[in-house]
C-alpha cells in the first residue's frame, strides 16, 4: 500500500498561525505580531512633519453634470417655448440682466429699452441648475433643486415681508416633478422665471432663465411626452 501523502498545510500569516492555529508548532512561532507592520511606515520617519501633513485643498469642489447622450449639446432638449405656449404663457424675449429682490422685479433689454415686469413666483424645474453669471441680484435667486429643501429656502428668501402689503401666497416657489405638474403650477404663475434644466449640460452661455408672462386665459393640459 502506497504511503499516504502528508496533508498540505495552509499558508497563514505568522501572527494568525500563532494565535489561531491548533498546531503546537505554530503557537511556538518566534515571530511576534509587533514585528510584522513596523517596516511599512518606516520610510516616512525621515521626512519632515510639513511633508507628511495634510491640508484641505483650496480648489472648489467639482460638480458633475450628467446628461443623456441623446440630449447632449441641446440637440433633443425640450422646447420650453412650445411647452409654455400650451398652458397659455406668453414669453418675454431677452436676457435677464438684473433681479430686484426688494421690488420683486427683473430687468431685461427688450424692444430697445429695458422692461420691468413684476416678478412673482420662481418656477425651477426638477434637477435643474441655473447658470449664475455675474448679474446683480442673481446670486440671491440662484437655485439648485437637486437636493431637497433648496426650493423652500429659495422661497423664504424672495418672499416679501408682511409690511409690504402682499400676502405670502403671492410669491410661491415650487419645483415641478413632471410636465403635468408643471402645467398645474403654472396656472397661477403671473409671471415667473423658468430655468432650462439642460442649459448646463449643453452650454454655459445664453439666457440664464426663461422669462414668461401668463395671460388671463384657460390653460390646457400638456402630456408628459412633451419633454
Curated annotation (Swiss-Prot):
Compositionally skewed regions (Low complexity) per UniProt: 48-62
Top-rank taxon: Bacteria
Name of this protein: Protein NifY
Region of interest (Disordered), ranges: 19-63, 107-128, 150-227
Species per Swiss-Prot/TrEMBL record: Azospirillum brasilense
Taxonomic lineage: Bacteria, Pseudomonadati, Pseudomonadota, Alphaproteobacteria, Rhodospirillales
NAD in keyword set: no
Keywords per UniProt: Nitrogen fixation
Family of the protein in this entry: Belongs to the NifX/NifY family.
A GO BP annotation: nitrogen fixation
